[in-house]
């Protein structure tokens, strides 16, 4: 879903920066508070960021001006919520843009909005709704939906910037086209990501019982 450097018109690039920045500021404040209250969570924050980096670096080519890959944000969503996930995602996306030529600086706001803000927020809502019903299902849903919704948002971002024709109908048609292209790879990838997230969370709970108490609270 990394929209490449220079692909978005300047007005849309600026819009998504303005959209994303408040979430990053709040995320930074949340990280500061978590570390002050529970210094032992530093390692878990690092693991969550590492998971985002590794999975989002596994890319498959796409003809949309973007690419397909897991997002890795589900773990951070489960452990820390959407605000912290937004900050960690932005840091990963910035690193990838500068050093790996994935995404870009002009499109950092748009990529952060999709992968770091909106996708994780939907995943977090699903986790909150399901965690008292079946915790493993809740983790799976959080990771899977964080991934899928990211690509829905990316499709909308591309459609808004490049509608097939003037008006709402052109935007809808373009969005449907982009989603159809992404779906070929992203539906199976999101399911796999959900399974991997459940396995990793289960392992972390085995070695860090204190985390289980915090997450299930």
From Swiss-Prot:
Subcellular location: Cell membrane
Highest taxon of source: Archaea
Bilayer-spanning residue ranges: 8-28, 44-64, 74-94, 107-127, 139-161, 181-201
Pathway: Cofactor biosynthesis; adenosylcobalamin biosynthesis
Keywords, ordered alphabetically: Cell membrane, Cobalamin biosynthesis, Cobalt, Cobalt transport, Ion transport, Membrane, Transmembrane, Transmembrane helix, Transport
Main location as per UniProt: membrane
Gene3D superfamilies from the UniProt entry: 1.10.1760.20
Entry function: Part of the energy-coupling factor (ECF) transporter complex CbiMNOQ involved in cobalt import.
Self-association state and partner proteins as the record states: Forms an energy-coupling factor (ECF) transporter complex composed of an ATP-binding protein (A component, CbiO), a transmembrane protein (T component, CbiQ) and 2 possible substrate-capture proteins (S components, CbiM and CbiN) of unknown stoichimetry.
The protein's name in its UniProt record: Putative cobalt transport protein CbiM
